[in-house]
């Protein structure tokens, strides 16, 4: 059987908001030989002046538009889909996450990795993690959904930070200093691991560095999701510079 000359191991269809400028380069940085990423943009109005009241409804628009992005990317016959948008993958707790995953798979007729499932798989890969803290670019209403999901998966959420982005595009503008400050605020002896959600926050390398400072797992959503996709497809290549998840598990 003939194979794609570049994606001879796997073609990944990547689904991400049209406002997102981070997930595509992040995933490409973690790409291994024989795997190619094919980005399909989910139409997303760039709402400015987002509030706690409007964030949930604004991200639901992304969920509704995801099916169009799937139909588009499936024309290149990818073997697997990787979800590059995390908020909606946590909505509705454990059952809501599974329903969203199933909706994607039923439309595409191929497997898929989503941020919520990938994050919990990553935490379990490290082992021994019970108490977590997390940060997001979201608002408290969305953080409540993330908290609910992790707690239904058996983790205790000790604390969380919502950075309250002004708009969807401005998520990528949070500085490294701001993110370091958030990590320092989250860390403590009462926390076994820290998780970062929100795929437009560039934290794949910062999280890897923070693991060294804190001597505990720091899971970046983009790292977890791409790792999950690779391992789900039997690709066990180890990568360095992105934290223990990709180099050890």
Map each language-model feature to its residues.
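Hydrophobic alpha-helical
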Residues: 180-211, 225-226
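Short, flexible loop segments at boundaries between secondary-structure elements
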Residues: 165-168, 214-238
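N-terminal glycine-rich anion-binding loop in soluble enzyme alpha/beta folds
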Residues: 1-67, 135-143, 147-175
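Short, well-structured alpha-helical segments in soluble
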Residues: 61-75, 178-191
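Glycine/small-residue-rich loop that forms an oxyanion/phosphate-binding "nest" at active or ligand-binding sites
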Residues: 66, 70-112
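Periplasmic-binding protein-like
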Residues: 13, 79-84, 133-136, 191-198
């Amino acid at each position: 059987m003939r194979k794609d000359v570049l994606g001879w191991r796997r073609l990944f269809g990547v689904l991400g908001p049209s406002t997102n400028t981070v997930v595509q380069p992040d995933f490409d940085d973690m790409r291994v030989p024989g795997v190619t990423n094919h980005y399909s943009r989910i139409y997303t109005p760039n709402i400015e002046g987002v509030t706690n009241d409007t964030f949930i409804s604004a991200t639901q628009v992304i969920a509704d538009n995801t099916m169009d992005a799937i139909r588009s990317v499936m024309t290149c016959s990818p073997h697997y889909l990787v979800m590059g948008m995390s908020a909606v993958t946590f909505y509705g707790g454990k059952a809501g996450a599974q329903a969203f995953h199933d909706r994607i798979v039923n439309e595409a007729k191929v497997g898929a990795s989503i941020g919520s499932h990938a994050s919990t798989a990553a935490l379990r890969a490290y082992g021994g993690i019970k108490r977590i803290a997390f940060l997001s670019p979201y608002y408290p209403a969305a953080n409540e959904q993330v908290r609910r999901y992790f707690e239904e998966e058996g983790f205790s959420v000790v604390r969380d930070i919502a950075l309250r982005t002004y708009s969807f595009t401005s998520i990528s503008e949070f500085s490294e200093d701001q993110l370091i400050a958030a990590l320092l605020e989250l860390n403590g002896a009462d926390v076994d691991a820290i998780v970062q959600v929100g795929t437009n926050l560039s934290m794949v390398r910062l999280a890897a560095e923070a693991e060294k400072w804190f001597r505990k797992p720091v899971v970046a959503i983009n790292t977890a999701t791409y790792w999950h996709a690779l391992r789900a497809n039997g690709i066990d290549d180890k990568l360095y510079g992105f934290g223990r998840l990709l180099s050890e598990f």
